[in-house]
Amino acid sequence: MKVRASVKKICRNCKVIKRNGVVRVICVEPKHKQRQG
């Protein structure tokens, strides 16, 4: 899980979702998981 000021899709499997007011990127590749912090 990377915590970033700006979250971006890294590959075509990445999805940007908003969960409880937190912007997250979920992906099949665990390295691509991010959240905005």
From Swiss-Prot:
Per its record, what are the GO molecular function terms?
structural constituent of ribosome
Give the keywords, sorted: Ribonucleoprotein, Ribosomal protein
Q: A cellular component term (GO) from this record? A: cytoplasm
For biological process, the GO terms are: translation
Q: Which NCBIfam families match?
A: rpmJ_bact
| Similarity comment text for this entry | Belongs to the bacterial ribosomal protein bL36 family.
Q: Indicate what this protein is called per its UniProt record.
A: Large ribosomal subunit protein bL36
Biological source species = Aliivibrio fischeri (strain ATCC 700601 / ES114) (Vibrio fischeri)
